[in-house]
Amino acid sequence: MWKMMIIDDEYFVRMGIRETIDWAVHGVEIVGEADNGTQGLELACRLKPDIIITDIRMPGMNGLDFMRCCREKGLHSQIIVLSAHEEFN
């Protein structure tokens, strides 16, 4: 089974990702959720997920900084960005 994490500051977005798809049918287990990049990084370092779905705009550490820190820490998770954010600088 693939291990997956969801990181988004919006509870209903996390719930939608978690409950809209029957992840187990696709061989995916949701092993953790976080509502900001800092918490997400701590969980990712501990859980070592195969897949991470993250938002960009979040309080504290944003998604871009989160992805940079993941690479610096040697995490090899595949990261999928889902965001309504319009501008990336």
Q: What positions do the PLM features span?
A:
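Non-catalytic signal-transmission and effector/linker regions of two-component phosphorelay proteins
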Residues: 1-3
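Conserved sequence signature across two-component system core domains
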Residues: 7-8, 34, 52
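Two-component/phosphorelay signaling modules centered on CheY-like receiver
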Residues: 11-32
